[in-house]
């Protein structure tokens, strides 16, 4: 902060307003943002109340590995974790359906390029098997409360170990909170990227009705180094 001053709330709000205006000028009618800082959501609520939200926005609240809102970015004075408030209150949708937040994004592991994706075996070109970002002791309470209160979950997982552990924890949560005690009987949670999955885990997506949210662009983006890494 000695070299680059910390942004102010008004600067962040102005940046969002400019981005919204440009997006509307380009013809965008809706944006989905997966893994938003909680502070951005608060500012968009304010912009919406002022009547300046020109496009529909659906946001997923981003979280770090310790179960806190991503970046700890909150513009209200409160000691309570924003994630806890969101989990208790359930999905947010304004009266005009312009701004909504129906879910939380978790992160199981890193990426292949940085060798952070969590694999069952070590990388071919480095002595590591990647790492896990989330922790079970902070993640499971989130999954259980999300099932009770109708909150969608999407989890970033790229390595086969990251995907397997995510499936394991989803399955454990589904067993503990059965369909009778869920706000949404069939929540259809997602695993984002789902890039490397062992054959025995593939059928589990179908059995648990989990969406394998894959992006074809990653096949191209990882093309030049995936062969060496794996």
Model region roles, listed by residue range:
Residues 1-85, 102, 106-162, 179-183, ...:
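Divalent metal-binding segments
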Residues 42-46, 165, 169, 200-204:
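A short acidic, amphipathic alpha-helical/loop segment
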Residues 47-51, 89-99, 175, 179, ...:
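Acidic (Asp/Glu)-rich catalytic clusters
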Residues 150, 167-168, 172:
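Glycine-rich phosphate/ribose-binding loops and adjacent secondary-structure elements
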Residues 196-230:
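Active-site-adjacent C-terminal substructures of enzyme catalytic domains
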